[in-house]
Every structure is written in structure tokens, then in C-alpha cells.
Swiss-Prot record:
Transmembrane segments: 4-24, 108-128, 198-218, 225-245
Extracellular side: 25-107, 219-224
Record's protein name: pH-response regulator protein palI/RIM9
Annotated GO CC locations: cell division site; growing cell tip; plasma membrane
The encoding gene: RIM9
Biological classification of the source: Eukaryota, Fungi, Dikarya, Ascomycota, Saccharomycotina
Amino acid sequence: MHKGLLILDLFVSICLTIQLLPIISVPITGKGIGYNLHLSKYGNYTFGVLGLCTSNNICSKPKVGYPPETDAFYSFMDDENGEYPDFAAAELPSRARYVISKLLVVHIVGFCFTTLLFLLSLALTVILWLEESETKVPFKDAVRKKVKIRQNSRNNSSTELTESTSATKMNSLSDEGTVDNERKSKDITPYLNFMLMLSLLSFLSTLLAFLSDILLFIPHLSYLGWLQLCPIILLSTVTSMLCFIKRSISSRKYLNDEYRYENDDMRKSVNVGVLNWKDTDSDDGFYVYTNGFYSNYNNDDTPQEGHSHAPELFPANISTHSGWIRHSGHNETGDDVSISSSRDDSYNEHENIQMRLLNDHEHIT
């Protein structure tokens, strides 16, 4: 995160420097630097963002828009001595009207947005750096305290050792709690949202300024005008990086907070139960396989062949065994273990009733 913010600071500072150059061009910086900072040079005039200058070191007052033909700036041409016979009113290279020259104010607007973006990015970097430095100091102090307590505990007796160990545990828990609380990072999403808005506004204003330069000064646009492509590219990169950083923070928060235990098996809490509607596991550790309430294992109570004319009281597919049968998960050979020992009395009574029914049937026949 800090590396990403440092890269953002670097990109924004480069944009800020390049956007500053057209603003301080002629007439603000004129003869002192040889009129080298200009957007265009056409005829006897050199054009900047806030005004123009002539080749004989006469510059207009810094303001938005170039002076029209009736402006007092051109009064030097009315000299009776005829010192400026070749001068006429300033004419833009693209033959555009002077009203369009007021579009150059978007250079200043874009510079203001970029300045705010740079200050906010720098402030966020400093805040995160201070937060990280504050969390490291208590952690180091806690480690040093633990080391000192361990050294002192070795020199004490066994009773003092137990007391010191309990104290160290309490101190370590409290120190870890404070460190964990301090290590909780702040929510920087509002800062990123504001930075994203500023980067978009700065990108759009810089793009509009470049288009206005092309509209006014093509085909005599100087290197300073073409250099404005760099802030456009860098600001688009900054906007994309801010979107990626914001997305990564929201995804990390989603995984760590809302679905912390569902998405991380190593962080499953003991008190949190996982419910599954397809759960087929047994609660006591083994599986139970039964055929209803009865088992057809060792079925010896079916009627004999000699009594085939009698009604079938006990079909062959039903067992007279009335106990619950448990099949172990490790035993798949068909060996059944009866766990109905507590119901022997009821089982015997049931067998007696069956025998009486058989005897009555034989007596009738």
C-alpha cells in the first residue's frame, strides 16, 4: 500500500511540474529567460497562457484571454517616429477569434486540481507512515519487556518463577491486545474516493487544455504544448491505480471481516458451527445402516412346507426379530450386532404370542 502511494506521489508531482510550465510562460517569464517558455510563436508575437509578448520586449498584462485589436496594448504602433512599421495586431496561427483564447484558463483549473490531489496524496502517505511507526514502537517495547522478565525469572525461586510467569502472561496478553488494537489500520476509503474524484477532474481539465492549445496554435504549437500529453497519460495511470487500490482494499475487507470464517479454514472459530443441508455424517462417529425397524438376518420363524395350506401369517420378507440393529462403519460383511438387550422381556412376550397363534391354528385344522 505504501509503495503504491509513493508511486502515486511521484506521478502526481511530475504532472504538477509539467502543468506549471505553461502557466508561468510569457508574459510572466519573458526577457529573463529569453521568451523560451511559450505555447506558440507566430509573426512578431510570442503567445502564452496569460498573455503575449512582442519581439521588441513589449508584453501585455497577465490576464485570461489575449488583448483584442482595440486594446491599449497596441498603442505602441501609433508612434510618430515609425519605429514599428512591420507590426500589426496580433493574429492567432489558426485564425481563431480572440474569444476562444479564454479557453486557456483550463490550464490553471487543471493545475489547481492536480495541486489538491498532490497535497491529499502526500498527507495520506504521511498519515500511514506515522501510524506504522507508532505501531512498531509499542511492539518493540513489549518484546523487550518479555526478554527482561524472562531473564529475571531465571534467577528467582520456583515460587517466584510461577508468579513471574503468570505476570508475564498477563502483561503479554495486555501488550498484544494493545498492539493488535493499534495495528488495526484506519479506513482510508474516503480519502481514496476524494483522490479519485480529483484525479478525474484533473485529467479532464488537462485534456481540455491540450485540445484548446491544438485549436488555437496548430500548426505552430511549440514543444511546451506537446509536452502536456505527459500529464494526460500520467493522470490516467493515477486514476487506474486508485481504482485498483480501492478495489483491493474492499476485497480484503470482504474476506477478512464479513466472511472471515467461511473463506479461511485456518481461521474457523470454535463457537461457529458450519451448517450443511447435505450433511450425511454421524454425530457419534460411525454410520448406521438399517432396513427399517427389523432385520431379515437369521430368519428361522417362517412357516414350514407341511403347512402350506395355512394362511401366511409371517411373510418371508419380514423378520420376527424385533430389535434395533447397529451396523458398524468398519464392518461391511453383514455381521449384525443386536443392542436390544434391554428389551428382552418384551421380546419374549412377543414370541409367546406368536407361538399361541400357531398352536391355535394347528388345533383348528
